[in-house]
């Protein structure tokens, strides 16, 4: 999944102005063990990555893994914070906001996605991107994630997914179409699917029925 995350972000930023001297600031929300945060921090065009998670246990794992890489130990390169997005201080200026805010495999676990997303928006710099991944609420996704992944194959623990919390791509589009300051025409989405023996693969049109990436740009 991680290589697809990076390629999707690159595709979103393809037409953004390139400023060689300007490096990117990331905010990774619900970072878990730091898989994406670490990989983003190693990119040559990255200035810094702030990764947050409300669960202390997973951050201990992330911190331990970070210490294995001298690059990640450079001051300001990768910072883990044990906090929720609701408790993270709001940026006081454009410079304090982030070029890319990521939310991977989190939205399908929250009770109220609308208010939750509202807490993310101020952290995105004007001209920056909010990039997330989640699961569409369809019978196909229920069969794949609840029945096959949990009950049949045992890939994830039972009870990991609550189908009623899944969020459809058109619901996210509708949310940002009404949200002031966001470019609804910039929305990008891409379906992805786990193929046993081959890993995660892009599935064009898969955003309508299964796992998908979703991104939207904040207006300048």
Residue ranges and their predicted role:
Residues 153-171:
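Acceptor-substrate binding/catalytic loop of class I
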Residues 75, 181-220:
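A C-terminal cap/extension of S-adenosyl-L-methionine-dependent methyltransferases
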Residues 100-111:
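A short SAM/SAH-binding and catalytic strip from SAM-dependent methyltransferases
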Residues 114-126:
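A short glycine-rich, Lys/Arg-flanked "PGG" loop and its adjoining helix->strand segment in the class I
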Residues 27, 32-87:
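Class I SAM-dependent methyltransferase SAM/SAH-binding core
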Residues 86-101:
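A short acidic, Gly/Pro-enriched loop at the edge of an enzyme's catalytic core
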Residues 129-154:
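Conserved class I S-adenosyl-L-methionine
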Residues 2-24, 39:
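Conserved alpha-helix/loop element of class I SAM-dependent methyltransferases that forms part
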């Amino acid at each position: 999944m991680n290589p697809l995350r990076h390629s999707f972000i690159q595709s979103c930023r393809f037409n953004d102005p390139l400023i060689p001297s300007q490096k990117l600031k990331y905010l990774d929300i619900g970072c878990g063990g730091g898989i994406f945060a670490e990989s983003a921090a190693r990119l040559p065009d990255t200035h810094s990555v702030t990764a947050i998670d409300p669960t202390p246990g997973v951050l201990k794992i992330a911190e331990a893994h970070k210490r294995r890489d001298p690059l990640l130990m450079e001051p300001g390169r990768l910072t883990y914070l044990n906090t929720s997005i609701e408790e993270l201080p709001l940026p006081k200026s454009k410079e304090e906001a982030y070029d890319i805010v990521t939310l991977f495999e989190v939205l399908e676990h929250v009770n109220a996605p609308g208010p939750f997303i509202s807490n993310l928006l101020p952290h995105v710099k004007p001209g920056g991107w909010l990039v997330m991944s989640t699961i569409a609420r369809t019978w196909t996704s229920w069969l794949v994630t609840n029945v096959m992944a949990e009950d049949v194959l045992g890939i994830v623990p039972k009870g990991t997914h609550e189908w009623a919390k899944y969020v459809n791509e058109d619901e996210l589009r509708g949310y940002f179409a009404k949200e002031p300051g966001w470019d609804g025409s910039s929305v990008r989405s891409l379906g992805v699917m786990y193929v046993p023996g081959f890993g995660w693969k892009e599935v064009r049109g898969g955003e309508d029925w299964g796992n998908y990436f979703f991104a939207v740009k904040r207006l300048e």
